[in-house]
Amino acid sequence: MTSDNLLALKGITKQYKEFRLGPLDLSVPRGYVMGLVGANGAGKTTAIKIALGAVLPGNGSVHLIDKTRVGVVLDRPCWQPGWQVRDLSRLLGPFYSGWNQRVFDELCEWAGVSQRLKVREFSRGMGMKVQVAVALAHGAELLVLDEPTSGLDPLARGELLDKLSEFMTDERHSVLFSTHITTDLDRMADLVTILDAGRVIASGVRDDLLEAWAMVRGGAADLTGELRARIRGLRQHSAGWEGLIAAADLGLCGAGVVADTPSVEDLLVHLAKGRKDA
């Protein structure tokens, strides 16, 4: 994997009254999509604010490429509610030497917004798409997106993910994508970092992480004491049990145990539950 990181967080911590983030190490190499996943309140937005310089960390260091090469898509646009779409190019364009008006106009058509539409009139999907339009119009190399698909209908969500996939056809580009909708990561992410209550519980190449674990299920007679001790996030029900186990421990499973490849959601749910049960 390339050492050409467009963003790198090292040893990041942030202490609030009732919440602590970190220590967090996270890198987004050129040409890769990093998915930052966790439940609401896990610390994803705090991590992104620290990455962008909007919040200072308690400890640690942040490396970020020049901010003129970074495109940001937040939960809600941070522009004045009374601005019209056409005002965005007039007011924001001069800050970027690479601003491309033609690209902006084409992307506004893709977003389905009139140049006269005001920011306060945006639907959630429009707000996300117009932020993407601004980011791509100024030639961003790194897109940082905070929960971009949350609350979108399936059509708008698919259109946004298609545009991000198109963006990633250029090997110079990278994406940091925070979400609690793990199916988005199944489609897009090369790398995954999973947060739970401010702590990293798994991080690495997505496919490697999925291969390192297995979802197992079986009947009550199959759950030996040794196997129980190795299972993360054990769930027991009337039909038997299920949980997550390291692939290296599959030899502990008897013939009645069924093993499957986990999803990112399985890792999030069962590793987080395993921490709480410990």
Residue ranges and their predicted role:
Residues L9-I12, F19-P29, G60:
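Conserved beta-strand
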Residues L160-I245:
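ABC transporter nucleotide-binding domain
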Residues L143-E147, L152:
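Catalytic Walker B motif of ABC-type/P-loop ATPase nucleotide-binding domains
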Residues T2-S3, G233-A278:
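C-terminal coupling/interaction segments
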